[in-house]
Structures are given as C-alpha cells and as structure tokens.
C-alpha cells in the first residue's frame, strides 16, 4: 500500500503532499 503523508503549513494554511516542491 502507498501511504501519503499530508503536511500542513501553519503560515499559509495549505495542505500538500510531500512532492518535489517542499518548502
């Protein structure tokens, strides 16, 4: 199974998966 970790940015309040565009 593929587990996707959702990262939340408290400053912008955006939810994005761990892609190559991680800040």
From Swiss-Prot:
The keyword RNA-binding does not apply. It comes from the Eukaryota. One of its GO terms (molecular function) is malate dehydrogenase (decarboxylating) (NADP+) activity. Its EC number is 1.1.1.40. Keywords: NADP, Oxidoreductase. It catalyses: (S)-malate + NADP(+) = pyruvate + CO2 + NADPH; oxaloacetate + H(+) = pyruvate + CO2. The keyword Oxidoreductase applies. Homotetramer. Belongs to the malic enzymes family. This is NADP-dependent malic enzyme. The lineage of its organism: Eukaryota, Viridiplantae, Streptophyta, Embryophyta, Tracheophyta.
């Amino acid at each position: 199974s593929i587990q996707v970790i959702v990262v939340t940015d408290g400053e912008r309040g955006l939810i994005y998966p761990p892609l190559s565009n991680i800040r």
